[in-house]
């Protein structure tokens, strides 16, 4: 789905407040990354840190990753409980690829303990469309007034 000039694939789940997408994969694994709108708001991303290692347990109090750009520094915690199964080293070494391809540049993969909980905790694009539209419209209005 296109909202303003931002893309939001229909097959993903979203956490609009944190500008994060979730993809539920096979075997209870979820991939996590930044939305197109999130990378735009952050500006050029120059550092992504994952303070967890593969095999480590995570929960909703755990920082899954942090992102640093010229405009923003953010630590991302999500309603995910499980075990880290993969970290995208390509993103760690070259974080600006999130700006180029936010949906092809997942950051961390977690084998979750309860997939149904993840599906309830995150929203499909239809359920959070108005939140993203509101934010995108603010950006367009700001750009037009500049």
Swiss-Prot record:
Cofactor note: Binds 1 lipoyl cofactor covalently.
Origin: domain of life: Archaea
Entry-linked SUPFAM superfamilies: Single hybrid motif
Domain Lipoyl-binding: 29-111
Gene3D superfamilies from the UniProt entry: 2.40.50.100
Keyword vocabulary terms for this entry: Lipoyl
Gene Ontology biological-process entries: glycine decarboxylation via glycine cleavage system
Coiled coil ranges: none
N6-lipoyllysine PTM sites in chain numbering: 71
Classification via Pfam families: GCV_H
GO CC entries: cytoplasm; glycine cleavage complex
Cofactor(s) needed for function: (R)-lipoate
Family statement drawn from the similarity comment of this UniProt entry: Belongs to the GcvH family.
Function: The glycine cleavage system catalyzes the degradation of glycine. The H protein shuttles the methylamine group of glycine from the P protein to the T protein.
Quaternary structure, from the entry: The glycine cleavage system is composed of four proteins: P, T, L and H.
Protein name, UniProt field: Probable glycine cleavage system H protein 3
């Amino acid at each position: 789905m296109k909202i303003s000039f931002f893309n939001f694939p229909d097959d993903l789940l979203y956490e609009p407040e944190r500008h994060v997408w979730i993809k539920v994969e096979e075997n209870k694994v979820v991939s996590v990354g930044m939305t197109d709108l999130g990378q735009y708001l952050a500006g050029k991303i120059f550092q992504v840190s994952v303070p967890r290692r593969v095999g480590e347990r995570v929960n909703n109090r755990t920082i899954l990753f942090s992102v640093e750009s010229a405009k923003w520094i953010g630590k991302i915690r999500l309603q995910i409980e499980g075990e880290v199964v993969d970290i995208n080293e390509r993103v760690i070494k070259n974080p600006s690829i999130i700006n180029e391809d936010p949906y092809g540049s997942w950051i961390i993969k977690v084998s979750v303990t309860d997939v149904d909980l993840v599906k309830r905790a995150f929203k499909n694009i239809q359920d959070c469309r108005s939140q993203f539209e509101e934010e995108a419209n603010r950006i367009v209005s700001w750009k037009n007034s500049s």
